A protein has these predicted regions:
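Metal-dependent enolase-superfamily TIM-barrel catalytic cores that perform enediolate-based chemistry
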Residues: 1-89, 93
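Shared catalytic-loop signature of beta/alpha-barrel
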Residues: 63, 70-73, 81-96, 101-186
Length: 186
């Protein structure tokens, strides 16, 4: 239940929550319930994994969801290869659009104005290269490096040195029963 997860996230100190926008859930009702239990300052990011198919179908849904002030980022609402469609979505929503780094190439993403920032993951060298490009392009991003609390601690170091890693990070360490650290990440 998304509302319970948002409430728990806020109670444990998180300022944002990332969820999957999926057609088998009533996303409008889930969002309504979630926004009722968290303040406007708490942000909800929605990852559609291109399930909204194209801009014509996506925009009515996205425009309705953006009425909730908590909605802050849409990740990949339609296929990233649809440059014209993504540009249209970006131009017609107040919500930031995030795209996975490298598809299409980030220079095209920036030049064509199809996103507001990136989802960046990978190993140490890739993170540093991608983060440097994002800084040069003045594009924010979130680090998406998932694993145990050890991985989360490793990712936190990159978040501390990459100037544009300012969107909420995704590391998923909370899903592990054993954290593998002697002191928890707070």
């Amino acid at each position: 239940d998304m509302a319970a997860e948002c409430k728990l996230a806020r109670e444990t100190g998180y300022l944002a929550y990332k969820t999957k926008g999926r057609p088998w859930f009533d996303i409008h009702e889930q969002l309504r319930q979630s926004c009722a239990v968290v303040p406007e300052a708490f942000k909800i990011d929605m990852d559609f994994n291109d399930t909204l198919l194209d801009a014509e179908r996506a925009l009515p849904i996205l425009r309705e969801l953006e009425k909730h002030p908590q909605v802050d980022i849409y990740e990949t609402p339609i296929p990233q290869s649809d440059i014209a469609g993504n540009r249209l979505i970006r131009e017609h929503t107040r919500v930031a659009i995030a795209m996975h780094y490298r598809k299409p190439p980030p220079s095209i993403q920036v030049r064509e104005g199809i996103c507001d920032g990136f989802v960046i993951g990978g190993g140490a060298s890739a993170l540093m290269r991608s983060g440097a490009f994002a800084a040069e392009a003045s594009m924010p991003f979130w680090l998406q490096v998932t694993g145990s609390a050890i991985t989360a601690a490793w990712s936190l170091h990159f978040g501390g040195v990459l100037s544009h890693a300012i969107w909420p990070a995704v590391d998923c360490h909370q899903l592990f029963k054993e954290q593998l650290l002697t002191q928890p990440i707070v």
